[in-house]
């Protein structure tokens, strides 16, 4: 019984010691925040079935909802079962700058369960730079000595020794241990190993993690880190020499099939081509109490899966501008930052939940000198527009009658039916509605008149045939060009003038005293290549085309538009065709007989009058 109590006590004591190596626990939440050059970032790890929500507090304690807002410079990434990230710029809303030059932001954190109930809530004050850690751009943005292009720069998670490579970029990996501050060795003028001396670790403030910033480029790995049993991943390095491989932070063994490969550590490579490569080994993951399958990039909003995954390694090779990588411009340097984190696998039992996974978070940083990038003179040629898709479809057309030849005003619906004298001009316009493509052109095919509102009513009289004035009319229809100066889309209009006429009954040749309606069939044309959308009415081809068909054979495949109303005629006289000779010989004789009868009547009247005059005399 005594041994059992001893074992239980030992486990309870040992567990906090192990967890203390990775994070500081505080009742409520496990969280951490970082101070950057232009802003601060809060990272909160939720418990199972929790979703983290953020609010900010002003100086009076009022709470305000936090959303992705470019005006307040707030950004939030919060998903169930994943770490929640809240980023705020130093010039963002409710960020206060104190007299000591530090920025303060009060954040209210609450964990919400799936049923909507708030499980835990806590206030956190973010202070940047941190009181016990002064962050300056010069502390990690020191430019390299002799820039050389096209060399990837790497850094390992556990640098035992290292030296600075010549190149235009820096890399940094930040491990999250409790306030372990490395003391850099004095700079050396000659290339060689530079080993950071690490003082004895001491615990910091509960509820936050302090950063151990390890700035080095091209870390040489110890031989024990290069003992990779299987599943070697070739290192991305230019050249195949041992020196180039080691400068890239990789292992070299000329006895192997791939002599340059990644070691048992975390390797970061930053490339001037716009990519970074992050490689983590299974041995490193197990050392930190995490599973390699649970490692991912923290800032990726929709997930950014590894480009390669084996039983021994996981590889991320992604563009610098993707996967949630943050970019900052500090002076003449570009800083790209992201984090490699691991999810906690929780096992739920009938009476509680446990986990055997540690908490792992690694801050990665790529730094480039912007002045080292060469300018590019580019000429941008706009691609050819795609060929138009031609197919049948509805068109909105309108036929209207103008009040005069200027086509500046038009009759309204209440003005119909119009009354016109024979041979008086009628000004007709057809236009395309609800189209703004200047390349479209309205094409008239057939225009005709009928005595009713039906376009198929008989009799009919053609006005335009195949887009040209009907040649069988002695009063030829006159086409009127659209005014390009006043019309925004002049090709959407067609205008013509006709002389007023009345339709005759086909059998009696009597004038129809009803009204006349006008119709036109039309389509929209879009020129392709050397083709045009104009109609030529003076060529032999056009005359042949016009005489080869009739409007009744084409109107069913086209859109038909009609006039808003009819044109009527008052007291239309009975007309005879000019070529008719019916009863032409008898009509003069009838007139002579009528004149003779009238003369006889008048003569009789005169004789009677004279007789009465003589009698009185």
From Swiss-Prot:
Mode of membrane association = Single-pass type I membrane protein
* Residue pairs linked by disulfide bridges in the UniProt entry: 226-251, 235-250, 245-260, 447-468
Q: Which residues lie on this side of the membrane: Extracellular?
A: 21-588
Q: What is its main location?
A: membrane
Residues annotated as signal peptide: 1-20
Tissue occurrence? Expressed in oocytes.
Report the function annotation for this chain.
Component of the zona pellucida, an extracellular matrix surrounding oocytes which mediates sperm binding, induction of the acrosome reaction and prevents post-fertilization polyspermy. The zona pellucida is composed of 3 to 4 glycoproteins, ZP1, ZP2, ZP3, and ZP4. ZP1 ensures the structural integrity of the zona pellucida.
Q: How does it assemble?
A: Polymers of ZP2 and ZP3 organized into long filaments cross-linked by ZP1 homodimers. Interacts with ZP3.
Any idea what this protein is called? Answer: Zona pellucida sperm-binding protein 1
